[in-house]
Design a protein with these regions (language model features):
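Conserved nucleotide-sugar donor-binding subdomain of glycosyltransferases
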Residues: 1-41
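A short, histidine- and acid-enriched strand-loop-helix "catalytic/donor-clamping" loop
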Residues: 17-18, 47-51, 67-82, 96
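Membrane-proximal helix-turn-helix segments that form the acceptor-binding/catalytic region
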Residues: 30-34, 58, 81-100
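Active-site proximal beta-strand in glycosyltransferases
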Residues: 41-43, 56-74, 123
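Carbohydrate-associated surface elements
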Residues: 106, 128
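A short, basic/aromatic alpha-helical/loop segment that forms part
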Residues: 131, 153-158, 174, 187-190
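Conserved donor-binding/catalytic core segment of Leloir-type glycosyltransferases
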Residues: 138-156, 162-166, 179-180
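Nucleotide-activated donor-binding/catalytic signature segment of Leloir-type glycosyltransferases, i.e.
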Residues: 180-183, 193-203
Length: 203
């Protein structure tokens, strides 16, 4: 899980790989994988799971990739000693990963410093959708639509977009317009979403 409220001990045990208290669970995973058709490559969805890299690599002899996409937000939710220990454990296991995939140039630069990952070991694959083969659809309405698709949190700036939308509506007068927002929202961001709704109520 990437829930920052989970106990620090659980995070550390996940990062300690098969040398921690979760060794039995790691062994079960490895035994199961050995009995299945082997993949061409294994991708860990975030660096908080890097403790699996070594055991999986040894069991499958397949390349290990690890996606980097904002783990520092969850690490910052840990209490000081746990955060420092978690970062140290991730750094210790960077060598077990063949390739890191960052979702932006900023992420690549930030994670290079945070986890001491050699920059040459990181490939940048921006988030997005390939539009080849698709055509623009006609609008189903004349409304001017502003869209937001990202995690709902202050650092993503939905409140800034809401303020801008309020100004836009005032400049547009009675012309039809709407703001459509979608994305993951953690339980700890409910009050933030209510603040954004309050801003939009002025539109």
């Amino acid at each position: 899980s990437t829930d920052a409220r989970l106990p620090g001990e659980l995070r550390i045990s996940m990062l300690q790989s098969d040398s921690g208290v979760l060794k039995k669970e790691f062994d079960k995973l490895v035994d199961w994988i050995r009995g299945e058709p082997l993949p061409d490559v294994i991708n860990l969805p975030n660096s908080l799971l890097i403790g699996m890299a070594g055991p999986l690599r040894a069991a499958t002899r397949r390349p290990i990739c690890c996606t980097l996409q904002g783990e520092e937000l969850f690490l910052n939710g840990l209490q000081g000693p746990y955060r420092d220990r978690a970062i140290a454990l991730i750094r210790d296991q960077v060598a077990d990963v063949d390739r890191f995939i960052a979702v932006s140039e900023y992420c690549a630069a930030f994670m290079t410093d945070l986890f001491a990952i050699p920059r040459a070991k990181i490939a940048v694959v921006p988030l997005g959708i390939r539009m080849d083969g698709y055509q623009w659809a006609r609008r189903s309405s004349a409304d001017y639509c502003v869209g937001y698709f990202a995690r709902v949190a202050p650092e993503k700036g939905l409140h800034v977009l809401a303020e801008a939308y309020v100004h836009l509506r005032r400049r547009m007068g009675q012309a039809p317009a709407r703001l459509v927002a979608a994305g993951y929202i953690g339980a700890d961001q409910t009050s933030y979403l209510n603040e954004v709704r309050g801003i939009l109520a002025r539109a």
